[in-house]
Amino acid sequence: MINELYKETRDRMVKSVKTLEKEMTRVRTGRASMTMLDGVKVDYYGTLTPLNQMASIAIPESRMITVQPWDISAIKEVEKGILKANIGLTPSSDGKIIRITIPPLTEDRRREIAKTVHNTCEEFKVAVRNIRRDSNDTLKSLQKDGDISEDENFKAQKEVQDITDEFIKQIEAVFAAKEKEILEL
């Protein structure tokens, strides 16, 4: 019963950290990344279609993304979709391929992005702590119902705290790595 609680707690915390890692891939760092275009949708024959389902996306240089639509007639719509996504990128087209140059970030913008990343990481720490609280509440109700003793409750809460500390450290590591990537010139 307690082991199931540990497993559920750990599983929920793993999901939180994975979600954070996925969110961090979307943060612009001054380097080109395929994930920068993840949210781009293109009006393709009246249907909003994800860009990655209608074009080849490549990164030929560290500050450039190329987008080659499979249907050349849709190139103008792809450009509009990138602009409408409002991700701070400006596409330029030669009629066959779209090139997106990633402008270098200013020092102020880098600090601003780092601050946003820090706030996001703090939100995920709160989420992990809420999972801990849920687990501790479950343990308290088990003790109240007489399913576990006070000693078992104390040991289990300590184990839940250890699991929480482990995941908080993972979140801090994700933040440190992303901050280094952002502030690096």
Curated annotation (Swiss-Prot):
SUPFAM superfamilies according to UniProt: Ribosome recycling factor, RRF
InterPro entries, A to Z: Ribosome_recyc_fac, Ribosome_recyc_fac_dom, RRF_sf
GO term, biological process aspect, one: cytoplasmic translational termination
One cellular component term from this protein's GO annotations in UniProt: cytosol
Keywords, alphabetical: Cytoplasm, Protein biosynthesis
Subcellular location field: Cytoplasm
Molecular function, one GO term: ribosomal large subunit binding
Main location class: cytoplasm
Family in the record: Belongs to the RRF family.
Role this protein plays: Responsible for the release of ribosomes from messenger RNA at the termination of protein biosynthesis. May increase the efficiency of translation by recycling ribosomes from one round of translation to another.
Name of the protein in question: Ribosome-recycling factor
Organism of origin: Desulforapulum autotrophicum (strain ATCC 43914 / DSM 3382 / VKM B-1955 / HRM2) (Desulfobacterium autotrophicum)
Gene of this entry: frr
